[in-house]
Amino acid sequence: GISAKTQLSKLSTGLQTAAKLVVALNVNANYVFLDEPTLGLDANHRELFYKELVKSYQEKPRTFVLSTHLIDEIQQLVEYVLILADHQLIADADVEEMLDRAHTVTGPEKLVDQYVAGLRVLSTDQLGTVKTAYVYDQLDDQRVIPDQVKLGHYDLQKLFIELTNGGSKNE
């Protein structure tokens, strides 16, 4: 543990972060802003923080604004996302709505290209004759999916990466 007499500046980065988080989670405010809150914490302590964040929210519902690069770790915690790239707001939406638009389309190159025509394709990967398109768009129920083409979804971190890389040359 941390002695009450120990100066914050004498602690390791991880312990400084932990001490600051204890204060942040116990502050009586309607909005709590946390910039890279898990900086210096190992995986176990990050997980503990996320659990304490949820517990704190359940005890006193309020808005937590998190700025983080560890998107995969917070995906299950967040309801709403703002994504900034080059000082520009590029996404401002409910997480569930965003993920409902994040699709992978995989199959033979020609069939994938035909299927994604007219859709917002953020990027593509290709391995031999198999192509994967990362689509960020609503898929029309009228689109016929060829048997050789598989649809899937991707997570918030992959969507963040694709959106902040400026979209695709395929748009």
List where the protein language model places each region.
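ABC transporter nucleotide-binding domains
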Residues: 1-65, 69-72, 76-79, 85, ...
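Residues that scaffold the ATP/ADP-binding catalytic core of kinase and kinase-like folds
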Residues: 24, 114-115, 159, 163
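Short glycine/proline-enriched coil/turn segments at helix->beta-strand junctions
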Residues: 27-30, 108, 117-120, 143-148
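Short, surface-exposed beta-strand/loop "edge" segments at domain boundaries and coil↔beta transitions
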Residues: 32-37, 112-115, 139-144
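Conserved protein kinase catalytic domain
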Residues: 50, 99, 160-161
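ABC transporter nucleotide-binding domain
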Residues: 54-65, 69-135
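C-terminal coupling/interaction segments
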Residues: 123, 127-171
